[in-house]
Each structure stands twice: as C-alpha cells, then as structure tokens.
C-alpha cells in the first residue's frame, strides 16, 4: 500500500527466517482471521506446510506450491544389476551400498550437484540445519552437517558420484549415465521431453540416517 514496494512477494521456504529477522515481513494471523476466504484457504493446507512459514508462533506466508525432494532411480539399471527397487525408510548405509553396486564403467550410482536443494535433504535427515532455531546463528560446523558432508565427499572420492560442481545430474540421468539422482517434481517435464516414461524410472523417499 506504500506505492514504493511490493505488498506481496514469493519467497523460497529457506528465506522465510532471514526475511523475518530483517523485518521484511509482517505477520498474517490477524489478516487471515478477519477474512473468511483466507481462513478457508489456510485450512486447506497441511499443518506441516504452514510450519515452514511460521516464526515465533506467527504465520508469515501461505505456500503457493511445494516440492518434496525424493530420490529418482533408473529401473532398468536396477534390473540389470539384479537389485530390488529401494523402499521408503531405507538408510544412508543402504543407499551408499546400492549406489556402489550400480557404479560401473561410464555409469555413476548417484549424482549430487552442489545446490542448496540437493544438499539440504542430507543434513535434514541427520537432524541438522545450516542455522540455529533463531534463524541467525550459523551451525555449519555442527556434527550433523559435518557428518553429511563427509558422507557425500566419501562417495565422490570413491568414484560413486561424478564431480559435483560441473555435473548436470538430470541430463546424466536421462542419458543413462547415472542411476540415481535427487530432485523434486520440477524435473519431470524435462525427462518427459527426453523420452523417459514411468516404465523407465520411479522415486523413493530420501534415505534417513
């Protein structure tokens, strides 16, 4: 309403705490409570989605979409290796063992590009985060973060994963150069355009520590 800046913006979930701590957002609780349509809209969301936009018991946003990171796997490569398809609830150790068995000449078991969304699930499944609950204190040297980085670095050093900085895991997956890759639903159209179908791949929950 100031005429000088947007009243509504779109933020990634990872930016909410930072925006609140810098006084860039205002709580929406009273606005939503006073509006029947917004109240009905809010009630449609799963509580777990709203938690990501809640800071100090105040709600600062409503999701306009969601992307759940999963592990996509090449079904044909699993079949050729004589491996069962992974199941929800598998562990880091089971994941590494599977990726190692899928690695052969010209094919990597897994690819993890060095992007925030690719790395976050690893420390999230190890009960860790880059910043403390106050949204300000860095925790990059915490045990959970270090353990996750060491785990990934070990797979790279052992040749299970390609070089993470320059590798395009999604293209490599479509070209049968990598057996597993982490992603959300955004990659599906790209793979469809590349000719992949549901017969070629499936997905499973991220492995847990």
Question: Residue ranges of each PLM-predicted region?
Answer:
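Bilobed periplasmic-binding protein-like "clamshell/Venus-flytrap" ligand-binding domains
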Residues: 60-61, 103-114
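Paired acidic/hydrophobic, glycine-rich loop segments that form the ligand-binding mouth/hinge
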Residues: 7-10, 179-183
């Amino acid at each position: 309403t100031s005429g000088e800046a947007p009243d509504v913006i779109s933020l990634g979930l990872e930016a909410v705490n930072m925006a609140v701590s810098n006084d860039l957002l205002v709580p929406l609780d009273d606005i939503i409570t006073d509006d029947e349509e917004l109240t009905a809209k809010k009630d449609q969301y799963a509580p777990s989605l709203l938690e990501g936009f809640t800071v100090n018991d105040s709600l600062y946003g409503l999701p306009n979409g969601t992307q759940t990171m999963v592990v996509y796997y090449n079904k044909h490569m699993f079949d050729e290796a004589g491996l069962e398809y992974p199941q929800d609830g598998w562990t880091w150790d089971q994941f590494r063992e599977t990726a190692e068995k899928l690695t052969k000449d010209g094919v990597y078991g897994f690819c993890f590009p060095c992007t925030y969304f690719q790395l976050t699930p690893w420390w999230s499944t190890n009960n860790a985060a880059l910043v403390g609950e106050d949204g300000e204190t860095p925790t990059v040297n915490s045990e959970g973060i270090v353990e996750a980085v060491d785990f990934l670095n070990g797979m790279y050093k052992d040749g299970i994963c390609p070089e993470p900085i320059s590798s395009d895991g999604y293209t490599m997956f479509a070209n049968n150069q990598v057996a597993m890759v982490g992603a959300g639903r955004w990659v599906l159209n790209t793979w469809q355009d590349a000719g992949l179908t549901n017969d070629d791949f499936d997905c499973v929950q991220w492995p847990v520590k």
